[in-house]
Amino acid sequence: MEITIQSVNFDATEQLKTFVEKKVKKLERFSDDIIQAEVILKVVKPETANNKEAAVKLNIRHKEAFAGKIANTFEEAVDLCIMALEKQIQKTKEKKDR
């Protein structure tokens, strides 16, 4: 799986990039058909508390999955996105198995 990480309005640290890659790679446990993952990290409103936004778009063979979440930290936002994508992938698998 090819993973692209884009940071908007700030420079992402190597530690953050490594964290994101590690989390996104875990999605391969749920589907072997994931071709590409695009992650966008962005600071929404610097003056507010919940201002870190993460959006993850997966290109899965013949379909796409997307999750976008806002939280206090990028790590928390990415975790929420990954959990949402896991549910989407599992629902798709269940429909496919019927």
Roles of regions detected by a PLM:
Residues M1-R98:
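N-terminal, polar/charged subdomain of small-to-medium soluble alpha/beta proteins
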